[in-house]
UniProtKB/Swiss-Prot annotation:
HAMAP family: Thiourid_synth_D (MF_00390)
Subcellular location: Cytoplasm
Superkingdom, taxonomy of origin: Bacteria
Matches recorded under NCBIfam families: PRK00207.1 (NF001237), sulf_tusD_dsrE (TIGR03012)
Quaternary structure, from the entry: Heterohexamer, formed by a dimer of trimers. The hexameric TusBCD complex contains 2 copies each of TusB, TusC and TusD. The TusBCD complex interacts with TusE.
Record-annotated active site: 81
Function: Part of a sulfur-relay system required for 2-thiolation of 5-methylaminomethyl-2-thiouridine (mnm(5)s(2)U) at tRNA wobble positions. Accepts sulfur from TusA and transfers it in turn to TusE.
Protein name in UniProt: Sulfurtransferase TusD
Family to which this protein belongs: Belongs to the DsrE/TusD family.
Signal peptide span: none
InterPro entries: DsrEFH-like, Sulphur_relay_DsrE/F-like, Sulphur_relay_TusD/DsrE
Disulfide bonding pattern of the chain: none
Length: 131
């Protein structure tokens, strides 16, 4: 069987539900099986996975940094819905300046994107899996 291109849609926060951690475990399985993980789109509460100010206890799994590491090692694009992020207090430097906000807190490695990035991923991937 040839390698498939996967894209993920994550709608759950990094902590408090299983959605994001299940998505991360699925992403690891996809890569481990020899498939190509192309992009991950964080939407709704899923945008909280990109919050640079998340600080889990030292004995807890740091899912936010795990996403970063996965992206760096596998060249996965981490897209964050800009509208959902701004509603939840997550912004990059550009948006913070545009909106006259005090600071930016988008975790490095994540990119604020519109729904067009999700549409493109849906069209170009063999499998889109939502969590």
């Amino acid at each position: 069987m040839s390698a498939l291109k996967y894209c993920l849609l994550v709608t759950g926060p990094a902590y408090g539900t299983q959605q994001a951690s299940s998505a991360y475990q699925f992403a690891q399985a996809v890569v481990g099986a020899g498939h190509h993980l192309v992009s991950i789109f964080f939407y709704r509460e899923g945008v909280l996975n990109a919050n640079q100010l998340t600080a889990p206890a030292s004995d807890e799994f740091d899912l936010v940094r795990a996403w970063q590491q996965l992206a760096a090692e596998q060249a996965v694009t981490l897209n964050v819905c800009v509208a959902a992020a701004l509603r939840r207090g997550i912004t990059d430097q550009h948006e913070a300046e545009q909106l006259n906000l005090a600071a930016a807190n988008l975790q490095p490695g994540f990119t604020l994107s519109g729904l067009g990035a999700l549409a493109e991923a849906t069209l170009t991937c063999d499998r889109m899996v939502q969590f």
